Amino acid sequence: MTDTQNKNYIIALDQGTTSSRAIIFDRDANVVSTAQSEFVQHYPQAGWVEHDPMEIFATQTACMTKALAQADLHHNQIAAIGITNQRETTVIWERDTGRPIYNAIVWQCRRSTEICQQLKRDGLEEYIKDTTGLVIDPYFSGSKVKWILDNVEGSRERARKGELMFGTIDTWLIWKFTGGKVHVTDYTNASRTMLFNIHTLEWDQRMLDVLDIPREMLPEVKASSEVYGHSKSGIPIAGIAGDQQAALFGQMCVEPGQAKNTYGTGCFLLMNTGKKAVKSAHGMLTTIGCGPRGEVAYALEGAVFNGGSTVQWLRDELKLINDALDTEYFAGKVKDSNGVYLVPAFTGLGAPYWDPYARGALFGLTRGVKVDHIIRAALESIAYQTRDVLDAMQQDSGERLKSLRVDGGAVANNFLMQFQADILGTHVERPQMRETTALGAAFLAGLAIGFWSSLDELRNKAVIERVFEPSCEEAHREKLYAGWQKAVARTRDWEPHENEE
C-alpha cells in the first residue's frame, strides 16, 4: 500500500460510442484534467454500425498521454487505471499479432437480427432470460460473435485452436495495454454478452453450443475492482465496469433500492437489487452491477427511448425553441401544462410497455393551450416515463425506491428535476460531479489498490450538489400520473402490424 502514498492520481479511461476520453482524478476525486478524441463511425450497410478497434486503442492511448501532459504529470505519479466502456460492442483478434480479424461490431448494429430470430424460433427466450437476465436482441454480444465467426472464413476453426480472442471493449483495451499478457473482463461486461450465466457467474456452455462459439476464445471473468495486470509503463489496471454500471457505482448506488437515471437522448435507469437477481415481469433486464467493494451485486435495467430527443424534436422539427436550455424558462412561465400530455412514442414505447406499434401524440388540446404548455408537457413526459420504469422496478424487486440519483445533460434543468421529484414522490439527488461514469471507474480502481480505503470515504467524495424534494400533494400527483397513463393507453397499437397492411 505504501507505494500508492506517493502516487496521488488515478486515471479513468472512458471509452464511449463516439469518442474516447481520459479523466485524471486526485485523492479528493476532483477532476485534474480531461482529454477527448472522437473516432470514425462506419456504416457499411443500413442498420450496420462498426468501429475500427485499432483506432479505438490509438485514440484511447492518445487521450491518456494528452491528459497527463495537460496536468504536467508523469505516468509514475499515477496510482492506477480504471476502465469504463461502451457495452456489448464486440472485437475478435489474433492472439499472436494483436490484430482484429474484423471491425468491432457496435452495440447499435442490427446485422445479427436473423440469428436472434432463429434463437426465438428455437424456443430459447425463456432459457436466455432465466440464465443471462437478457432478452434476445442483436444489441448483445453473443449474436455478433456468431456473425463474425460465420462470415470470416476459417475463423471458427482458428478460434477452436486458441488462435483468436474475443472481448468487449474493456477486454480489448487491457489486452493492448498489457502487451498481450492479460485476457480478462469483469462481471458487469460479461453480463451483457448473452453468453454468461449471471447466477453461477460462469460462461454458459449451452449458449456457447447454441451459437457455436468456442470457449477457448473467451476471457477470464473477474470482479470489477482488483488488479488485473499492469500497463507497459507499469501502472496497475485495477477497475473495470460497463458504462451504465460504472455510473451506478460513481453515484454510490451500492445498496438495494438505490437507483440512478442517466438523462441522455434516451434515459438509462438502473436499480441496485443487492444479492437478489430479480426476474422482471415488465421487460426489464436483469444485469450485474457492483456492491460496496466492487463485488457482484445485481441490478434491474430499463431504458426510455425518447428523453432528450423529445426536446431536440421541439427545437429542430417544430422550431418552438432555439436551444434546449430555453425549455426551463418556458415551462416555468405557466403554472401547469393546462391538461396537455405529450407522449413521445416516436419510435414506439420502451420499458415497461414494449410496444413497437405505439406512435407519438399530443392530448388535451384546447384553444387556451399555448406553446409554453406544450414545451412543459414535453419535459414532463421525460419524468413520467422515468416513473413508469421505476414503478415497474419496485414491483419486480419488492424494493422501495430510497432516492433517485441523476446524471446526464438534462439534469441541469431545474424544472425537470423538481417535476421528477414531484411525480415520483421521492428525493432526486443531483451530484456536484457530473462525470459519474468515469468517477465510478476511478473509485473501483482506487478501492482495489488502497488509494481509497472504504466506502464511507468514497461517499464523502460523491458530493450531492442539490436535493430536489417532492412539493406536491399525493392526490394531485396521482391525478397527474393517471392522466399520463390514459394518454399512453391511447397511443398504443397505432401503427398497423405487417400482416394488417
Curated annotation (Swiss-Prot):
Residues annotated for ATP binding in this entry: 17-19, 265, 308, 312, 409
EC top class named in words: transferase
InterPro entries: ATPase_NBD, Carb_kinase_FGGY, Carb_kinase_FGGY_CS, FGGY_C, FGGY_N, Glycerol_kin
Signal peptide: none
A Gene Ontology cellular-component term: cytosol
Residues involved in glycerol binding: 87-88, 139, 243-244
Keywords of this entry: ATP-binding, Glycerol metabolism, Kinase, Nucleotide-binding, Transferase
An example molecular function term from Gene Ontology annotations: ATP binding
Its EC number(s): 2.7.1.30
Catalytic activity: glycerol + ATP = sn-glycerol 3-phosphate + ADP + H(+)
Presence of the UniProt keyword Magnesium in the record: no
Gene3D superfamilies for the chain: 3.30.420.40
Binding site for ADP: 17, 21, 265, 308, 409, 413
Reported function: Key enzyme in the regulation of glycerol uptake and metabolism. Catalyzes the phosphorylation of glycerol to yield sn-glycerol 3-phosphate.
Record-linked HAMAP family: Glycerol_kin
Protein name as it appears in the record: Glycerol kinase
